[in-house]
């Protein structure tokens, strides 16, 4: 044991680890950490690369900037957010730049290329430079889209954005349809309780991936900013290449996610799909959407359930509980009376 040393990204006693064995073992080993604040901020290295006054908006702190009240905050898992700062430059009336961690080496360069591509297409804020793994972009003033704030312009923009990803950002799928089916079955059984039975869910067999795409992967409503020049997508660079489902996948995942997170009814969903289909030429999207709607809802059910369990007695844990209930209601509605009757009968 004395020869095992731990180099975690942040110092912790391990009390929040899910595994009892991991919690016990963690305490036996010495830890060595280098705080970002010491190595980069207090040393002056970060300011040398990004001159100006910095405001830390990591771990959900960005919500203080764009919302008037905590009652309006969307749920955030602080540990799943990248480090980011608002940059206030001399004589500017407000923040002029956003500096966020993108990754070192090719990881960062690939994010820069994607940002440049999406900016050229008119969908995301302009990237300016990449230094020390951090990407500096123009800060776009505006308001995050909230519940009930869907407009025709937003649906047109979302459709055009997803059609652009479909046409221009092809990639090998990260997981197969069988793996998605396994995720669906596991998350529904764990999220809806032991009374749930796999034979209630008649998922079609076969492969449902028409074309792999480097997805957006974060089609939450608040990730769309209503600005003076139209709607802009934020947090669009790397969720196809992180630790979460589904990686690179059929664009139907993002389209299903958009319909869920914008709380679209049948008419709104039809409008979004038709806009997307007319721009992309993807004639089979309507056939693939039902499978991916269940897949997305199942993923979010698992994510929000785990997030609420790991965040303890915190405001974000309570927000995730509300989100979990919403996804359960949507799943019940999607699967119909068979599942509802089985759960409550």
PLM features: residue spans?
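Structural alpha-beta junctions
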Residues: 2-5, 19-33, 93-94, 118-126, ...
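Conserved ATP-binding subdomain of kinase catalytic cores across diverse folds
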Residues: 62-201, 221-223, 228-230, 234-298
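Pre-Walker A segment
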Residues: 201-203, 208
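A generic structural motif
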Residues: 2-14, 24-35, 126-135, 244, ...
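Long, compositionally biased intrinsically disordered regions
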Residues: 339-345
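Catalytic-loop of the protein kinase fold
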Residues: 211-221
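Juxta-kinase regulatory segment immediately upstream of eukaryotic protein kinase catalytic domains
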Residues: 25-70, 191-193
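Helix-rich C-terminal or lid/interface subdomains of diverse kinases
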Residues: 6-12, 16-19, 23, 27, ...
């Amino acid at each position: 044991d004395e020869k095992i040393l731990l180099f975690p990204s942040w110092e912790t006693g391990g009390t929040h680890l899910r595994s009892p064995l991991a919690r016990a073992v963690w305490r036996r080993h010495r830890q060595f950490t280098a705080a970002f604040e010491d190595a980069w901020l207090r040393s002056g290295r970060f300011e040398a690369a990004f001159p100006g006054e910095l405001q830390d908006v990591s771990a959900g702190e960005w919500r203080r900037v764009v919302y008037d009240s905590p009652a309006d905050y969307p749920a955030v898992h602080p540990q799943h957010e990248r480090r980011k700062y608002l940059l206030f430059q001399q004589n500017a009336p407000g923040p002029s730049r956003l500096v966020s961690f993108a990754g070192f080496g090719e990881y960062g360069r690939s994010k820069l290329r994607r940002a440049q591509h999406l900016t050229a297409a008119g969908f995301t804020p302009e990237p300016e430079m990449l230094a020390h793994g951090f990407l500096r972009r123009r800060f776009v003033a505006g308001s995050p889209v909230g519940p009930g704030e869907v407009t025709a312009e937003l649906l047109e923009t979302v459709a055009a954005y997803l059609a652009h990803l479909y046409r221009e950002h092809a990639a090998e799928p990260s997981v197969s349809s069988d793996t998605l089916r396994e995720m669906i079955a596991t998350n529904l059984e764990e999220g809806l309780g032991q009374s749930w039975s796999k034979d209630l869910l008649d998922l079609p067999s076969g492969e449902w991936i028409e074309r792999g795409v480097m997805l957006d992967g974060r089609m939450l409503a608040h990730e769309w900013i209503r600005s003076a020049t139209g709607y802009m997508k934020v947090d669009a660079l790397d969720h196809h290449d992180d630790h979460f489902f589904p990686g690179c996948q059929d664009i139907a995942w993002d389209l299903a996610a958009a319909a869920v997170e914008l709380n679209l009814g049948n008419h709104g969903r039809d409008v979004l799909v038709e806009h997307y289909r007319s721009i992309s030429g993807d004639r089979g999207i309507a056939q693939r959407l039902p499978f991916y709607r269940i897949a997305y809802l199942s993923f979010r059910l698992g994510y929000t359930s785990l997030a609420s369990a790991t965040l303890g007695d915190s405001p974000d844990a309570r927000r995730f509980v509300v989100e979990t209930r919403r996804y359960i209601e949507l799943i019940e509605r999607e699967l119909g009376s068979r599942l509802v009757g089985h759960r409550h009968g």
